[in-house]
Design a protein with these regions (language model features):
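N-acyltransferase acceptor-side catalytic subdomain
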Residues: 1-193
Length: 193
């Protein structure tokens, strides 16, 4: 590409295509602890992130309640771009009513839960997360994402073809008066949750 020597013409630089995102799974408390520095950095990049998404809150929560929350290890999905952490979905799979339910870590004792996604990559990142869940569909029956705010990227991304999808408005937060939302996703027959 030739650059103009005319100073009134803006210089043109080749556009750089976004790099593909890499998906990794973290399935142990130790693995989560090793992510703390990157996790904090990602948290600072997300303008709508809450205290309940910080490692300083979720790691002690998991140490205290993880075993009673799920008999299985955590199932945290991370997204990386050029080696940098750009997405984190802190999940666990629980046995409920004879089914396997994917839930966000921290549920039950936090007001606002969500995934952390770099704002520039959030729509693509959530799509990749849903694709990853679809690829691992033999591990779960239903996803239930509770205590989501209206701005949650989990609420607004279409699901893969063939999935069931229901969003419900929940009780408002007692401190802010803002409503929480619950999104339920499933593949195969719908189960009661």
């Amino acid at each position: 590409m030739a650059l103009s020597t005319d100073t009134t013409t803006p210089c043109l630089r080749p556009a750089r295509a976004p790099t593909p995102l890499e998906v990794e799974e973290v399935v142990s408390l130790r693995g989560l602890e090793q992510l703390q520095g990157e996790w904090r950095w990602l948290w600072t990049r997300c303008p709508t992130a809450t205290t309940f998404q910080r490692p300083e809150w979720l790691l002690p929560w998991f140490r205290s309640f993880g075993a009673s929350f799920s008999s299985q290890p955590p199932w945290v999905i991370t997204l990386r771009s050029e080696g940098r952490l750009v997405g984190l979905a802190p999940l666990a799979i629980r046995e409920e009513n004879g089914g396997r339910v994917v839930r966000l870590l921290g549920e039950g004792s936090a007001e606002h839960l969500d995934v952390l996604m770099d704002p520039l990559l959030a729509p693509h990142g959530v799509r990749l997360l849903f694709d990853w869940l679809a690829l691992n569909g033999e591990r779960w029956d239903t996803c239930v994402f509770e205590q989501l705010r209206e701005s949650s990227p989990l609420l607004h991304k279409p699901t893969p073809e063939g999935w069931g999808d229901r969003t419900e408005t929940r009780e408002p937060c007692p401190r802010t008066g803002l409503h929480h939302y619950r999104r339920i996703l499933w593949h195969g027959p719908e189960r009661k949750v």
